[in-house]
UniProtKB/Swiss-Prot annotation:
The gene is pnp. CDD domains: KH-I_PNPase (cd02393), RNase_PH_PNPase_1 (cd11363), RNase_PH_PNPase_2 (cd11364), S1_PNPase (cd04472). Belongs to the polyribonucleotide nucleotidyltransferase family. This is Polyribonucleotide nucleotidyltransferase. SMART domains: KH (SM00322), S1 (SM00316). Coiled coil: none annotated.
């Protein structure tokens, strides 16, 4: 038995088939939004996973290229590892769902989203988010939902909900908001310097749209929802906590965590754990495996009380005080640009590399409108940054997510391709970490880009606000610039990046069941204040304006415009002409469909030579024009010259010398470079050239 439910969502039909496919999953929703089709399933293990102190949730978003009628490239001709977009979408699905599961639930849960058909006007990412929420809501998996998600654009100053592809292309905002019935639970945004008040308007408008979807989900659950199953709670026994407090008093725990040096705090906690292990080894050996989790919760309770009740932060700062800041540029002498930003014990060194546009990242995903991206930001988080030993396995989901967030924050201030015809890569290396490395990456990337001579429009800074809540909605405290401990034990990580004039990126993670309007408004306000302080007091003194030229080790680019109809002449058959220019000059050449030609190299003379070759190729021969050519062939009647690869002409023997000659070889040999003047067309309509009529004044 199955049933289809439908509603109108932003002028398009959203329909959900329940009971039609994937019947063995705990919950399955076959989603249709326009012509976009996504199968969302939720499954849970029968038993809890032993020996863990976290909820084992896994979210997958699978892009199948058949969804857009494409065959995967490569040798195997099948989908391989998840794309960057798939990883980012999995993370954005995870964020609103995770807080709504029970904190002490230890059964493995997997949310899988299979994209099977894509309508460019109906977002598969949004469809998957709604599908995951529905599949869990109708399943027997414990879940405190429902929740719903809306995307918001800003076109000509007006908010647009769940925008089409055409609207997204001109939108100043790409906002995703997830909500429960009464609170906002997730915010993700990229924006073109959208003012704070407009951003708040968009967030709360999306929250209202979400209520319509939640009512729709309620109808599905009422008819097809399963009874939620029971589970074994993994809470620490109360008698163990009582025993711990006899060994380590609350005052001693507070003293252990109250320091501005992370390593000192960690050493204090290690000593507490060792002390408890000695005591319990004799009295309660069955508790030994619970010590780590118990001490974690003891720390958490202590830190939260210090902040909420005593207004005292673990490192001694005021509630809205930012950690010690430092900024500098040009630490690495041979790179194209470098910048380092330090915030307390968080330190990021970012390196900028410039390259021709042909080095832009090629994209082969479901979004057929996006073929490549010119700006790339990569974030690395090595184990030494937190004093650990761990082999490097390449970037994980967290690294990809942090890199994308900083990338999104900086895109609005980058120059256009016409203004700055380079592909740009920034790499943020985490030197040291104690919270908010992604926002430090935004600051360091801004410094590095300016040092590299990238003419960004404005400086961008990022900051994160935290939250500690009490028993009521009115009992809370928003913290500015959270460190790692406040992130771990707090309720929110609200990251905001932007310029003086507006927001460029937001990412909000929470561990509670949502945020009230008052909390969101305060977080937005606090991040703006902190952002302006960082730009004015720290970043501007380090480098106030982008360098007027790229660095001496960066490639130079000269750009000219040619008639688009002449592109084929420059490229030549199978690339023969353009490859010959590249071989002779050592430059790189890019040509777009509009006829913009970019010549990239480090030797100015060779770049000028390549430009002259291209201009010669696209120039129509006219009487009186002077050209320089190389003798490539000699015949009895004259010599053939190559003016540029693929561009040749002939000089008749009578036009070679002012003196009469019997043989061309008397004056010219193969390889000679000579200057000629164009005589126009002869009686046969052929272009003729003359060496003897060339004069220096030509």
């Amino acid at each position: 038995m199955y049933k289809s439910f439908s509603m109108e969502l932003a002028g398009r039909t959203l329909s959900v088939d329940v009971g039609r496919v994937a019947a063995q999953a705990n919950g399955a929703a076959f989603m249709h939004y326009g012509d976009t089709v996504v199968l969302s399933t939720a499954t849970a293990s029968d038993k809890p996973r032993e020996g863990i102190d976290f909820f084992p949730l896994s979210v997958e978003y699978e892009e199948k290229l058949y969804a857009v009628g494409k065959v995967p490239g490569g040798f195997n001709k099948r989908e391989g590892k998840a794309s960057e977009n798939a990883i980012l979408t999995s993370r954005v699905i995870d964020r609103p769902m995770r807080p709504l599961f029970p904190k002490d639930y230890r059964n493995d849960v997997t949310l899988n989203n299979l994209v099977m058909s894509v309508d460019p006007d109906c977002s598969p990412e949004l469809t998957a988010m709604l599908g995951s929420a529905i599949s869990v809501a109708i399943s027997d998996i414990p879940f405190d939902g429902p929740c719903a998600t809306t995307q918001v654009g800003l076109v000509d100053g007006e908010l647009v909900f769940n925008p089409t592809a055409a609207q997204k292309a001109v939108s100043d905002l790409a906002l995703t908001v997830a909500s429960t019935r009464d609170k906002v639970i997730m915010i993700e945004a990229g924006a073109n310097e959208v003012p704070e008040d407009k951003m708040l308007e968009a967030i709360f408008a999306a929250h209202e749209v979400n209520q319509e979807v939640i009512q729709f989900i309620d109808k599905i659950v009422a008819e097809f929802g399963k009874e939620k199953h029971g589970y074994i709670s993994c809470e620490i026994p109360e008698e163990m906590f009582a025993a711990i407090k006899e060994v380590v008093t609350p005052e001693q725990m507070e003293e252990a965590v109250f320091t501005d040096v992370k390593q000192v705090r960690e050493e204090n906690i290690r000593e507490i754990k060792n002390k408890l292990a000695e005591v319990f080894e004799e009295s309660n050996p069955e508790w030994l495996h619970l010590i780590d989790e118990a001490v974690y919760k003891y720390q958490k309770k202590t830190v939260r009380k210090m902040i909420l009740k005593d207004h005292k932060r673990p490192d001694g700062r005021e509630i809205h005080q930012i950690r010690r800041l430092a900024a500098e540029v040009d630490m690495l002498p041979r790179v194209h640009g470098s910048g380092m930003f330090t915030r307390g014990q968080t330190q990021i060194l970012t390196v900028t590399t410039l390259a021709p546009l042909s080095e832009a990242q090629k994209l082969d995903g479901l979004d057929e409108a996006e073929k490549s991206k010119r700006y790339m930001h990569h974030y690395n988080f090595p184990s030494y940054s937190v004093g650990e030993t761990k082999p490097s396995r390449g970037p994980g989901r967290r690294e990809i997510g942090h890199g994308a967030l900083a990338e999104r924050a900086l895109i609005p201030v980058l120059p256009s391709e016409a203004e700055f015809p380079y592909a740009i890569r920034t790499v943020s290396e985490t030197m040291e970490s104690n919270g908010s490395t992604s926002q430090a990456s935004v600051c360091a990337s801004t410094l590095s880009l300016m040092a590299a001579g990238v003419p960004i429009k404005k400086q961008v800074a990022g900051i994160s606000c935290g939250l500690v809540t009490g028993d009521t909605d009115d009992d809370y405290l928003v913290l500015t610039d959270i460190q790692g401990l406040e992130d771990f034990f707090g309720d929110m990580d609200f990251k905001v990046a932007g310029t003086h004039d507006g927001i460029t990126a937001i990412q909000m993670d929470i561990k509670i069941h949502g945020l009230t309007r008052a909390i969101i408004e305060e977080a937005i306000r606090r991040t703006k204040e902190a952002r302006e302080y960082i730009i004015n007091e720290v970043m501007t003194p380090a480098i106030a304006e982008p360098r007027t030229e790229v660095g001496k080790y960066a490639p130079k680019i000269i750009q000219i415009q040619i008639d688009p109809q002449k592109i084929g002449d420059v490229v030549g058959q199978r690339g023969k002409t353009i490859n010959a220019i590249i071989e002779q000059t050592g430059v790189k050449i890019d040509i777009n469909d509009e006829g913009a030609v970019s010549v990239c190299g480090t030797d100015k003379d060779m770049m000028d030579k390549a430009i002259n070759m291209i201009r010669t190729i696209v120039t129509e021969f006219e009487e009186g024009q002077v050209f320089e050519g190389k003798v490539i062939s000699i015949k009895e009647f004259g010599a053939f010259l190559e003016f540029a690869p693929g561009k040749e002409g002939m000089v008749h023997i009578s036009k070679i010398s002012k003196e009469r000659i019997n043989h061309v070889e008397d004056v010219l040999t193969l390889g000679d470079v000579v200057k000629v003047v164009c005589l126009g067309k002869d009686k046969m309509g052929r272009i003729s050239f003359s060496i003897k009529d060339y004069k220096e004044e030509n």
